[in-house]
């Protein structure tokens, strides 16, 4: 695999996570927000970034298990919804000081 091929695969997997978390690819976000610098993750909340980090690990496991990309996207979206619900509820409890 060439470096260019590896970069394309990495970008595609990053967009799987972006769609699961934010409902859009990085390109779609940039087109919707041309006035903003950076990328979608630069504007994510702490909880969204925590969720994304968890989803990256889960996605790696799903890839190792041979789960097709479409199925991974559905599962990761469900995981994102559940994790964000938990993280947002934890914020309200002030568990970390």
Label the model's feature ranges.
Residues 1-97:
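Positively charged, phosphate-engaging catalytic surfaces used for nucleic-acid and nucleotide handling
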């Amino acid at each position: 695999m060439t470096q260019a091929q590896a970069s394309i695969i990495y970008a595609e997997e990053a967009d799987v996570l972006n769609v699961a978390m934010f409902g859009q690819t990085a390109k779609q976000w940039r087109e919707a927000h041309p006035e903003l610098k950076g990328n979608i993750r630069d504007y994510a909340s702490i909880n969204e970034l925590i969720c994304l980090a968890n989803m990256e690990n889960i996605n790696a496991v799903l890839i190792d298990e041979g789960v097709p990309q479409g199925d991974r996207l559905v599962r990761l979206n469900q995981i994102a919804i559940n994790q964000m619900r938990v993280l947002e509820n934890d914020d309200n409890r002030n568990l970390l000081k």
